[in-house]
Amino acid sequence: MKPVSHALIWHWGAPAVVVHQFPVRHATPQAVAEALAAGRSTEVVTGHIGLDTYIEQGGYRLLQQCHAGERSADSVIQALEGAGLRGLGGAGFPAGRKWRIVREQPAPRLLAVNADEGEPGTFKDRWLLERDPHRLLEGVFIAAWAVGVDKVFIYLRDEYPGCRALLLHELDRLQAQPPVPGLPAVELRRGAGAYVCGEESAMIESIEGRRGLPRLRPPYVAERGLFGRPTLVHNVETLFWVREIVDRGSAWFAAQGRHGRSGLRRFSVSGRVAQPGVKLAPAGITLRELIDEYCGGMQPGHELYAYLPGGASGGILPARLADVPMDFDSLQPYGCFIGSAAVIVLSQHDRAVDAARNVMRFFAHESCGQCTPCRAGTAKAVALMAQPVWHAPLLAELGQVMRDASICGLGQAAPNIVDGVLAHFAHEVAP
């Protein structure tokens, strides 16, 4: 059996090995043997900002102002709109507009937090949860107040047992010591382990107890989502920004970008850089700037060769395009998108074709099988890409069919990396 790329989500600590549910980062045979001998099976998250410390640092003050009538729901939504905050999980839909759409729907309304984080190369949401869970929760409660939400569901990746235990503990603390009366109930749901459950309608199917299959749209989840009710769906990082944007003002956030872009975002950087990890950087930063200013440059003996700007689904670009601003829409002319900002850096010791084959095997493995273009298309692409010389016209035609006819973004985005290899690394697959 050929190896399949599963996102272990410890990319910044590669090579990583998971012993039961205990991650061994920068793994060596000795370190793995020690973990086995010690019987370590679960990671315990420590060092996070707990409830008492969060309150001492001004946490939940904004939520209290909202409930006391010092802030109006419309002013909070206007702050998000003025800041230009967009969904930071992949689609990039304007957050303020989404709040208005759901708010205008008939009650009862629900909120679903997508913490599934299945895109290979992405680990920023886990990083945030392990450090400052109450900043997320305050964003959740402010959104629930502004939109009029009755109940919140947090769909958490099952490979994050430490985050789950942490959130359960902090939610118990909030129940015993609520910052405001009448907080909506929050229910944690374990992710089903499928990549496709990161798609919002598939996630909703999974929360409802069914197999995570994407829905045909319309209706959209903002109109008919969880249990048939209007549902606000947000990624962890999007909600993480709510408190700071409203506190500091939309103008502050909008002024942070580079190269004509606006805002800040967290990049999950892995690969051949000297200092991988989660990097808070201006929207629109270029890869070259990101590597030089935030990652300590490339690793010794490695030169930039290629990069994936948006994880497995975001396509691939060569080093000569390392000065393209990385933000929504700016990468589309090159057949790529930023998605969840999972930046994977390759050097001259890597081959783009190997990355592409690994990515397509991942998509073929993770296809839910509901629609033929994705189910059969990814399998056919794997077979065609296994050849030493690629049949470019056939792969291009296959990719177009997948984009046009697949139900969800998995099948629509899977051909991106194929197109990138053919456009920029044809020498690797040519006769």
Model region roles, listed by residue range:
Residues 1-2, 18-36, 61-80, 107-109, ...:
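Ferredoxin-type iron-sulfur electron-transfer modules in oxidoreductases and energy-metabolism complexes
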Residues 13-18, 91-92, 96-99, 122-125, ...:
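Short acidic, glycine/serine/threonine-rich loops at helix termini
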Residues 34-82, 234-237, 241-249:
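Flexible inter-domain linker/hinge segments
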Residues 54-61, 113-125, 221-226, 268-273:
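Gly-rich Lys/Arg/Thr-decorated short loops/hinges at beta-loop-alpha junctions or inter-strand turns
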Residues 80-101, 193-205, 209, 364-376, ...:
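Conserved phosphate/anionic-ligand binding catalytic regions in large, soluble enzymes, centered on
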Residues 132-146:
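Histidine-anchored nucleotide/phosphate-binding helix
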Residues 139-143, 283-300:
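Short amphipathic, charge-patterned alpha-helical segments
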Residues 164-283, 295:
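Hydrophobic alpha-helical positions that pack around
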